[in-house]
Amino acid sequence: MNYLKCLKGSSNPDDFVQSWKYKRAFRSEHPEYFDPDGIMVFCGPQGAGKTLSAVQYVIKLAQNYPHMILVSNVAIDDDVLGGVKRYPYTGLQDLSKYNNGYAGVVFLIDEIQIEFNSLESKNIDPVVITEIAQQRKQRKHIVGTSQVFNRIAKPFREQFKYAVMCRNICGFLQINSLVKGEDCMVDEQGNVKTNKVKRFYWFHTPRIYRAYDTYAKIIRTNTVGYGGGKR
């Protein structure tokens, strides 16, 4: 027997129709279903608008998915979250601590390289990577910011779904370039090289400025290392 034939699946057109009906019925039964997953990191130097862009993105997610919960080290005003439950991010253990079924969990981690430092990449607990790799099944979405792409540990970067390169002009015109993580190559200076880019242009607003504390200091939340030892 040629066991490779076991790789073949159905070629019955009726199965296509039944699969479509199944998925439509599933979404009807679960209107709270959270579509985003994987890791999206906003990158750029200080003043590039990366935190502003990440906060706006999360606020829009909250508007579209009101049943999600948010775990963050950025103090976003509850008024702009529309009633979405918000919890403070306290460390890597939160990635497995918070679950919300089909309704989803968003982790917004400003300066994410503080947690996933490339200089400590050899000490990353495999359990953490396993948790990250299973985000899609658990409807979890990690949104982070980082000044330099390659300061984030490589095992973590390899799990990226998207990276967003941020810059702004005159302090109010935002230009963000979206690239797929699988298409990214990083040079020695930490610059992301890719041919597949989608750009977004938008203006800053006073509302988004007031939505969070732009001058808050991000501290290292974990004092325990990835392998259980002290950092």
Predicted feature locations:
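Hydrophobic anchor at the beta1->P-loop junction of P-loop NTPases
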Residues: F42
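N-terminal pre-Walker A segment at the start of P-loop NTPase domains
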Residues: M1-E32
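Conserved nucleotide-sensing/catalytic segment adjacent to the nucleotide-binding pocket
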Residues: D79-Q138
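Conserved lysine of the Walker
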Residues: K50-T51
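P-loop (Walker A) phosphate-binding loop of NTP-binding proteins
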Residues: P45
